[in-house]
Amino acid sequence: VIDVGTRLAAPFCAGLLGEMGAEVIKVEQPAGGDFMRTIGPFEDGYSLFWAVEGRGRRSATLDLRRSRGQDLFRQLAAHADVICENFRPGTMEEWHIGPADLDPRLVLVRISVFGQNGPKAQRPGLDRMGIGYGGLMYLTGYPDSPPVRPGVTVSDYLTGAFCAQAAVAALYARDARGRGTGAVIDASLYGSILRILEWTIAAYDRLGIVRQREGNRLPNSAPLDNYPTADGRYICIVAGSDANFARLCRAMDRLELTEDPRFTTLAQRAANADVINGIVAEWTAPRNATEIEATCVAADVPVASAYTVADIVSDEQVSARGDVVTVEDPVLGPVRQQAPFPRMVGAPPVVPSGAPCLGEHNREIWCDLVGLSEDELAGLAAEGIV
């Protein structure tokens, strides 16, 4: 897999393929490398974002804006199965490394904000444009407040994940199903968001409903909210169904609520959501989060604390499943990070190699794989091509 992308979406796709077992080669500009290397937080000037999302691949530098660099890229591509890119549409063609210039057996993953065609295709943009035009930003937040972005770059990650799935399917069709040719996967950041909008488009089409922000609640379920606790935390309780509501009432020692005509059915509880959520909040407010969670777990009520990262890395479930691994970074040494996900039962755990230094593997890639001599590589370095 050749990762010729920048920032996050295409590199994340390549990284997922690497965590499935692919060999990934990161191709970066000689001056500075991937922009991801410049994004904080930093430890002694070194990007921790890069330490996570640059892992599991080798780094080779190459100036794709110059004809010799383009020629070398085509030579490298002859060894590849998949190429992942997220340049503005037309850039690969301008550099003579687009689909028409490459082996048709390649699977070319192309990610951009708006896709390769359409009236907005040439606009610049990042994750924020994806969640904006995809409709997620409008739906995120509280009804009486402006739209807000989700806590992480959802459209970049989601598009990368969808594209990794598509790349594997394309390889399967090429090899196992005998198609013989690869595929061009054309993905937009906003399109990945559209795909997870649940019933939003269908309800607008059939009922004229324009879905609005709902905060932590759902319009057709209650009690359901993030409730305050005595120790300044928030805890999510989901007890919309009749069975879960009865269990919660028993846990709160408020069984009489199950007979209250305002709460006897799901529809009635949803219609009186402010009231029932207020009752639950009154129960949680004087109690600590751990006490509330233990009580709900004992009663078989769905519950979750709103975890900070400190909670995550110390949680016994995370530890038991190996969801945080220690990656040996070439600059920082051991760094705890998210483990590859998902995992196959019975397969040995995968611990990715650390994110490479810029051009760390130039000799391996350009000499051992592509076939340049040491003198040729030195000449290219002197010219700034690598």
Enumerate the language-model features and the residues they cover.
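N-terminal helix-loop segment corresponding to the beta1-alpha1 unit
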Residues: 1-177, 357, 363-386
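Aromatic-enriched alpha-helical interface/lid elements that frame and gate functional surfaces
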Residues: 223-299, 303
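Conserved Rossmann-fold dehydrogenase catalytic segment
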Residues: 116, 144-154, 175-193, 212-219, ...
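Oxidoreductase and adenylate-handling cofactor-binding alpha/beta cores
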Residues: 160-183, 195-207, 249-254
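Flexible, small-/acidic-enriched active-site or ligand-binding loops
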Residues: 331-379
